[in-house]
Amino acid sequence: KIWTEDDVDFRGDFYRIHDFTLKPKPLNTPERPNPELFQGGNSTAARRNGGHHADWYFSNGKDFDGVTEQLVEVRDHARDAGREVKFGLNGFIIARDTEKEAREVLREIVAKANRPAVEGFRDAGQQAGNSTADKRGMWADSSFEDLVQYNDGFRSQLIGTPEQIAERIAAYRRRGVDLILGGFLHFQEEIEYFGARVLPLVREIEEAEQNSADAPV
């Protein structure tokens, strides 16, 4: 209602709204009558809810096997509900001219982390994650190193040379990932490096794969 009406009142089990008006309201078009809904989570309940209701399901950082397992389950729920869901993945990107340089940056980030802060977040996060019925909630199995970049961004292993990172991004795409939410250490300089050195390689890989798919058999 708050997307389409003014002075909204709502009384629910978990929150209440009184005389609320949202401005500006979302753009309303026939093609998209409401904003796309993004949901994160890891538990069985979150995956089911995402498949049934979300337009995008966002995952913490995961390796290939972890992404595939989660993606298949969420999209199975979506298919059962007669829907389609796009999939996003968190990933911390460390792109350098050599893999050695990139790994050294990773080592330095972990070494300089605020240990009490990370451990405090880990303890609270794992308590919450393990409170779910299946103990599969967010951060339930995250290590100290995973949580230095708070949403397990290092697990996606987007760390290395531009060529290595581009190949890994393409591999995630093949597995069904539609979008990567990238994090950077020094974001202004590193986004520029990523755009100049990594992204063109990703586009080259995608174009080559498309040309191969379109080639006559």
Predicted feature locations:
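Hydrophobic faces of well-ordered beta-strands that scaffold small-molecule active sites
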Residues: L37-G40, D55-S59, V85-F92, I180-G183
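Glycine-rich, proline-tolerant flexible connector loops at the mouths of alpha/beta enzymes
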Residues: G61-D65, G182-G195
